[in-house]
């Protein structure tokens, strides 16, 4: 199956109507009754101006999905760290939507401060699809600027970042702004229907959940000697934990989020696990991230979530979600069914969840009923980060320890000649976390 965050190439207009209110409510917390008078755009039928921050494959796909979702929207500003990525995305979007792209070169911004210029360019809606490290910073700036936000997953790579996102989500609710998360399975009809039945008791009390995200190799690039260390790591962002969070955070969060949803977004008490780097050993190509993770999350009610993710070439792949309860079993991916006393199987169309999430966002803006996915997107991100923490350190850690972690993966400064937080040794090799040696901070 394609990765949930792989670039979208099908840019045909969606024929689906906007989500009904029940779908929107399940997709996030409705901040009903809040006035949009202080927000970026009044409800109605006016053109909504989109700004994009992060123009790689996911960013390009998200722009297309947004424009398919609302035919009265227009792309007016773009930012990316790299000029070639920005111009490539602009060319693709112009080809797909020739009459709805109003981005001149004066509204193409590059470098680490490009996001500020997008926010100052009169946009109503901002798409955040930059490397995950930057999302807390950019989300904070967007909300403070009064913009509605589509925020890709994950939303942070460390505890301070998660806490920042929670604060931004609270501010967005006070200001009547929408935040829609890129955790797209919450907007998939089959997933939503199945998990709603689980929440209604179709499998009884949940005893065990298993989330599996075992795929082939993703990411990795060879060093270009013309690049500074910061440029190389930014080009190869997926393979550096300070930028991506590691693959269990950047990818496996989609699976973990479904179990979080089934647990009503209540965090676990603690977690323990194991992980390592057996195949992804070529340096500097694969940076400092692991290639496999296994984590057990323990909840206060006795439920356990067993989480597995692996990126090895030439191996059996499996991306599935299974919940076992006192009355039956729920299979989300791939079959959307309940087995046991209350048998059921989803028969409808799943819908294009990549477009559906944007439909929900634009409908919320036009109706004056903002959506705020901020709490669950932050908690699901923290769930994944907790898994990385226990595997890197080899320790059992509580949720409270993790959410209050002081480990800040930010560099001292953002500049092309600055040192990233992870630097190679004299042989060009990066330090990799070692369980039992790496300390929890």
Place the predicted regions along the sequence by residue.
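N-terminal secretory signal peptides and thylakoid transit peptides that target proteins
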Residues: 5-26
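N-terminal Rossmann-like dinucleotide-binding module
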Residues: 25-98, 259, 434-441
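Predominantly a Rossmann-like dinucleotide-binding segment in NAD(P)-dependent oxidoreductases
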Residues: 54-59, 173-287, 293, 297, ...
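Glycine-enriched catalytic-core subsegment of oxygenase/oxidase enzymes
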Residues: 65, 74-79, 269-441
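A structured beta-alpha segment of the ubiquitous adenosine-cofactor-binding alpha/beta core
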Residues: 96-128
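N-terminal glycine-rich "phosphate-gripper" loop used for MgATP/nucleotide binding
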Residues: 130-132
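Beta-strand-loop-alpha-helix segment that lines the small-molecule cofactor/substrate pocket
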Residues: 136-187, 201
């Amino acid at each position: 199956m394609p990765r949930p965050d792989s670039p979208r190439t099908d840019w045909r207009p969606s024929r689906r109507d906007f989500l009904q209110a029940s779908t929107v409510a399940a997709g996030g917390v409705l901040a009903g009754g809040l006035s949009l008078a202080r927000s970026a755009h009044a409800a109605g039928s006016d053109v909504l101006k989109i700004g994009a921050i992060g123009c790689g494959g996911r960013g390009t796909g998200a722009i297309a999905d947004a424009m398919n979702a609302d035919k009265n929207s227009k792309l007016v500003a773009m930012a990316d760290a790299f000029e070639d990525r920005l111009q490539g995305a602009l060319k693709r979007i112009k080809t797909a939507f020739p009459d709805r792209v109003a981005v001149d070169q004066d509204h193409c911004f590059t470098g680490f401060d490009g996001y500020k210029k997008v926010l100052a360019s009169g946009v109503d809606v901002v798409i955040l699809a930059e490397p995950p490290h930057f999302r807390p910073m950019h989300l904070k700036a967007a909300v403070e600027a009064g913009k509605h936000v589509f925020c890709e997953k994950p939303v942070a790579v460390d505890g301070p970042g998660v806490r920042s996102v929670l604060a931004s989500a609270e501010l967005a609710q006070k200001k009547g702004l929408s935040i829609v998360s890129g955790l797209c399975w919450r907007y998939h009809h089959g997933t939503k229907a199945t998990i709603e039945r689980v929440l209604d008791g179709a499998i009884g009390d949940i005893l065990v959940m298993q989330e599996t995200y075992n795929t082939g190799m993703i990411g990795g690039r060879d060093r270009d000697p013309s690049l500074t260390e910061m440029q190389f790591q930014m080009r190869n962002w997926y393979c550096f934990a300070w930028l991506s969070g590691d693959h269990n955070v950047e990818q496996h969060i989609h699976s973990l989020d479904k179990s979080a949803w089934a647990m009503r977004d209540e965090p676990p008490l603690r977690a323990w696990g194991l992980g390592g780097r057996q195949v992804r050993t070529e340096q500097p190509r694969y940076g400092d991230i692991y290639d496999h993770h296994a984590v057990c999350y323990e909840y206060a009610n006795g439920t356990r979530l067993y989480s597995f993710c692996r990126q090895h070439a030439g191996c059996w792949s499996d991306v599935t979600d299974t919940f076992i309860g006192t009355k039956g079993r729920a299979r989300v991916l791939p079959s959307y069914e309940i087995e046991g006393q209350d048998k059921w199987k989803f028969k409808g169309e799943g819908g294009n969840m990549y477009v559906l999430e944007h439909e929900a966002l634009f409908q919320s803006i036009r109706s004056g009923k903002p959506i705020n996915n901020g709490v669950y997107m932050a908690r699901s991100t923290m769930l994944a980060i907790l898994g990385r923490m226990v595997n890197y350190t080899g320790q059992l850690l509580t949720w409270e320890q993790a959410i209050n972690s002081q480990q800040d993966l930010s560099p001292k400064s953002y500049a092309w000649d600055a040192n990233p937080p992870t630097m190679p040794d004299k042989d060009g090799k990066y330090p990799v976390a070692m369980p039992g040696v790496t300390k929890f901070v």
